[in-house]
């Protein structure tokens, strides 16, 4: 009888399969935001006005311009469903973030090319705000969602909201597609 009661208890994630485990991953609620950010980034990358001739800021996107432009809305959504963020704002660059933490928010980008529109500035702001929020809540989740080393998460978590806004706009040119140094991966995904 005791075993039967346990199996019917919906609060323990038991044998009835109706409830999720009580031990959910801390970052589970961030996945939806990662999908939204990915979707915005993919939409910007697919814009026909951004071609190789106009100096697209992402070489891997310019290289496969035809594949990106052929993505229909459903394919774009599927591509956005990675359980992590595919937008990178130098989250793996420990030295750069330490410099920002030491010198304030006036760290200029070292990326060639110009950000094509203010929409990229907004994407940079949303990316950094999301990274900042996650880094403040849980460094291990920041590591998984953004591939952010703990020392970078510490630097980002210590920023003020004003610093986040300023840094995002100043660093919009540093936005890049995650794994952009692996064009074959992106060709296969597209």
Label the predicted regions:
Residues 44, 134, 167, 188-189:
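Residues that form generic nucleotide/phosphate-binding pockets
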